[in-house]
A protein has these predicted regions:
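Conserved donor NDP-sugar-binding/catalytic core segment of glycosyltransferases
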Residues: 1-4, 225-271
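Cell-envelope/extracellular polymer assembly enzymes that use nucleotide-activated donors
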Residues: 52, 131-136, 163
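A conserved acidic beta->alpha catalytic loop
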Residues: 168-179, 198, 226
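Catalytic donor-sugar/metal-binding loop of nucleotide-sugar-dependent glycosyltransferases
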Residues: 45, 55-73, 100-114
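Short aromatic/hydrophobic "clamp" motif used to bind/position activated sugar donors
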Residues: 218
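Short, flexible, basic/aromatic active-site loop/helix in glycosyltransferases
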Residues: 3-24, 250, 255, 267-284
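Short, acidic, metal-binding catalytic loop of nucleotide-sugar glycosyltransferases
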Residues: 151-161
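Glycine-rich, basic loop-to-helix element that forms the pyrophosphate-binding segment
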Residues: 196-213
Length: 284
């Protein structure tokens, strides 16, 4: 008897998701030989010993499978962490230690912070940033919108080494060209713009801007975005320079603090769709 609630539909295997929380849960099957090889459960991780185990196990094998079916239910009772994170606070301390040690084993210096309410962790990588970031922004006029974007980048970004490349596609507004000259005057070392007056093709414009870039990392940005936090580019750069990472995305918000998207899921809505559209930015 009981009421089903808080469904947890788990995604496919993702090593970085596993660093943010133990999304494997309790129903996990591991070969006994592998469990013995890694030393089984360890003392000192009470409350999160299963998390520590799967972190170590997934470092020793690439054969990790996800069964996309609802196979078990987890009860919620007064003595369970399923009810509240306050029931077993030591479990989250142990989990933080397990993550920290996993990152140390992998040679990735990082700071691990517990996110109360989410029951997960934020990983801040501490390796020195290497290489310049080139921001490529396509536009057709939209002077006021673009001005908000560019001023927010230059006034709020605390990254030490970046450049901005604007690609104009068939712009006609005289105010736009005047603004481009003003930006060249204000940011002579970090700003350039080019005209590409071919028929509109978003991918072609991005490729054109990439050819003009001098950075080791390319950051594709729409002209209607605005920087909120100064460390935005440093965080993206710290992830993109990791050997296992090919591309990095971020959470985008509308002006009313709801989510525009927090990633793209293949298959959602038929082909692909944005996740968490309309949720509050700090929602669970």
């Amino acid at each position: 008897k009981g009421l089903h609630s808080d469904a947890h539909f788990k995604p496919q295997w993702c090593p970085d998701h596993l660093l943010s929380r133990n999304y494997f849960g309790h129903l996990v099957v591991i070969r006994s030989a592998l469990v013995k090889e890694i030393g089984g459960f360890r003392e000192g991780f009470e409350g999160s010993q299963d998390y520590d185990l799967v972190l170590r196990a997934t470092e020793r094998t690439t054969h990790i499978e996800h069964v996309p079916r609802v196979l078990y239910h987890w009860r919620i009772h007064a003595a369970s962490a399923a009810l509240s994170e306050d029931v077993k606070p030591y479990a989250y301390v142990a989990a933080k230690t397990a993550i920290t040690e996993a990152l140390q084993r992998r040679g990735e210096p990082a700071e691990v912070d517990f996110l109360s309410g989410y029951r997960g962790y934020r990983i801040s990588f501490k390796a020195p940033l290497k290489g310049k970031v080139s921001i490529v922004i396509p536009t057709k006029d939209k002077t006021e919108v673009l001005a908000t974007c560019l001023h927010s980048i230059f006034n709020r970004t605390d990254h030490p080494d970046f450049e901005v490349i604007v690609v104009s596609n068939n712009s006609k507004d005289t105010a736009f060209f005047a603004f481009m000259k003003e930006m060249e005057r204000l940011q002579p070392e970090r700003f350039r713009w080019y005209e590409n007056n071919t028929p509109f093709n978003f991918s072609a414009l991005m490729n054109f801007g990439t050819e003009k870039a001098t950075g080791e990392h390319i950051l594709f940005l729409n002209n209607d975005t605005e920087v909120i936090h100064g460390d935005w580019m440093r965080i993206m750069h710290s992830w993109s320079q990791r050997p296992s990472i090919g591309a990095v995305g971020v959470k985008l918000l509308y002006h009313n603090d709801t989510i525009q998207h927090a990633g793209v899921v293949i298959g959602l809505g038929g082909v692909a769709g944005h996740t968490f559209v309309g949720y509050h930015k700090d929602g669970p």
